[in-house]
Amino acid sequence: MKVDDKISSFFALLKLSIDSQKDLYAFANNPDFALFKKLFISFDAREVKIEGAKQLHYFLIIHDIELHAEFKSAGVFTRMIDFLNEQGINIWVDDIVNNRLFEFLHNKGYKASIHKNRMGWISCMFKLAEKP
């Protein structure tokens, strides 16, 4: 299967999963994603109480932002973020490794809240900015 075919299959499954379930836990743990987790990116789901918020917010957690070489030039991560943005899904990125990712997500309309644990690891939750 060619890279473009794999990417197209991934997004078709992603859209179907989100449209049919609207449940990030079920989506992130869908066994059909096992192949793509190895090829593209590792993800999970989490609900987070944001300080001052009245409700829980749901985030898709992206654990590994390093893609295999054959997929880097195909724009997989950019396409995934665009897709999640269109679906209104918040993102939690574990282990931030470069500022370009911050800038990219900020430009897409996400507001960052940075967290550092006791070991010094940085993770960042990106909540979609409220539309006026």
What is each residue range found by the language model?
Residues 125-130:
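Core SAM-dependent methyltransferase catalytic element
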Residues 72-86:
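Conserved acetyl-CoA-binding loop-helix of GNAT-fold acetyltransferases
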Residues 1-28:
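Short amphipathic alpha-helix that is part of the acyltransferase structural core
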Residues 95-123:
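Conserved active-site alpha-helix within GNAT-family acetyltransferase domains
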Residues 63-72:
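A short, internal acetyl-CoA/4′-phosphopantetheine-binding micro-motif in the GNAT/acyltransferase core
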Residues 85-98:
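Conserved GNAT acetyl-CoA-binding A-motif
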Residues 30, 79-83, 102-104:
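Hydrophobic, well-ordered beta-alpha structural blocks that scaffold small-molecule cofactor pockets
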Residues 28-59, 63-64:
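A conserved beta-strand-loop-helix scaffold within acyl/acetyltransferase catalytic domains
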